[in-house]
C-alpha cells in the first residue's frame, strides 16, 4: 500500500482484520481485471481512493440498524463487496444481496464473497427479473440515470427503506428529469472523494 492508501485505510475506522479483507479484495480485483474489466485499467493504482473509499462512504449514510442491503448492478463489487466487508465487523447480523447480469462478473462476486467469508447472495440476473426483496437499503453505483434507478429500485424497497445513489457533477439535471416521473425529495450529501460528486439519499418515492 502507498502512503495515500494507508491514509485512506486509516480513515475508514475499521479493524486490522477488516482492512486485511479489503486488501484481499483489492488484490482479487487486480488479478481478475485483465480478463473481465472490473475497473478502469488506469485506476488500478488508485483502487483504495477511487474505488474502496468511494464505496465505503455510503456506510455512514445507511439506515441503522438494517437487515438487507440490495446492491444493483454490482459489477466488480463496488460498492457491494466493500460494504459487505465492513458489515462483517460493524453489522454482522445483516445480509447483502448483489445483482449483476454479467455472468463473468457474477462469478467474480461469488469468488470474492467466498474468499472473504461475507454474508452475500449473488443473483446473476437482471434486476427486473427478481421478486421483491424488501430491502432496507438499496445502492447502485454508475448503473443508470436517476429516473431509471427509481424504477429499478422501487419494487424492492421496504416501506421504511432508503436508496443511496452516488452521482456525478450532473446530479441536479438527473434530479430534475426524475421528478417528471417520480415524487421524491432526495437528500444531497457531498462525496468525500470527488468535490463535484454527491450521494443522493432517497427515503421515499412514488411514481407520478
Swiss-Prot record:
Family annotation (InterPro entries): rRNA_ssu_MeTfrase_G, SAM-dependent_MTases_sf
CC per GO annotation: cytosol
Annotated binding of S-adenosyl-L-methionine, by residue: 73, 78, 127-128, 141
Alphabetical keyword list: Cytoplasm, Methyltransferase, rRNA processing, S-adenosyl-L-methionine, Transferase
Keyword rRNA processing on entry: yes
GO MF annotations, alphabetized: rRNA (guanine-N7-)-methyltransferase activity
Cellular compartments annotated: Cytoplasm
Predominant localisation class: cytoplasm
Entry's EC annotation: 2.1.1.170
Reaction catalyzed: guanosine(527) in 16S rRNA + S-adenosyl-L-methionine = N(7)-methylguanosine(527) in 16S rRNA + S-adenosyl-L-homocysteine
Function: Specifically methylates the N7 position of guanine in position 527 of 16S rRNA.
Family: Belongs to the methyltransferase superfamily. RNA methyltransferase RsmG family.
Protein name: Ribosomal RNA small subunit methyltransferase G
Protein's organism: Cereibacter sphaeroides (strain ATCC 17025 / ATH 2.4.3) (Rhodobacter sphaeroides)
Gene: rsmG
Amino acid at each position: 500500500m502507498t502512503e495515500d492508501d494507508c491514509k485512506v485505510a486509516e480513515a475508514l475506522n475499521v479493524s486490522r482484520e477488516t482492512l486485511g479483507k479489503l486488501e484481499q479484495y483489492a488484490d482479487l480485483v487486480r488479478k481478475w481485471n485483465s480478463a473481465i474489466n472490473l475497473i478502469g485499467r488506469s485506476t488500478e493504482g488508485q483502487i483504495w481512493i477511487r474505488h474502496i473509499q468511494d464505496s465505503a462512504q455510503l456506510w455512514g449514510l445507511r439506515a441503522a440498524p438494517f437487515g438487507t442491503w440490495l446492491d444493483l448492478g454490482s459489477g466488480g463489487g463496488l460498492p457491494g463487496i466493500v460494504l459487505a466487508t465492513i458489515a462483517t465487523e460493524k453489522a454482522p447480523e445483516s445480509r447483502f444481496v448483489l445483482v449483476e447480469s454479467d455472468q463473468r462478473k457474477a462469478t467474480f462476486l461469488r469468488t470474492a464473497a467466498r474468499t472473504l467469508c461475507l454474508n452475500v447472495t449473488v443473483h446473476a440476473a437482471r434486476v427486473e427479473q427478481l421478486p421483491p426483496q424488501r430491502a432496507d437499503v438499496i445502492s447502485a453505483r454508475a448503473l443508470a440515470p436517476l429516473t431509471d434507478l427509481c424504477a429499478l429500485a422501487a419494487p424492492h424497497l421496504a416501506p421504511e427503506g432508503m436508496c443511496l445513489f452516488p452521482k456525478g457533477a450532473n446530479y441536479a439535471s438527473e434530479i430534475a428529469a426524475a421528478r417528471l416521473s417520480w415524487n421524491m425529495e432526495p437528500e444531497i450529501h457531498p462525496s468525500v472523494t470527488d468535490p463535484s460528486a454527491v450521494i443522493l439519499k432517497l427515503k421515499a418515492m412514488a411514481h407520478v
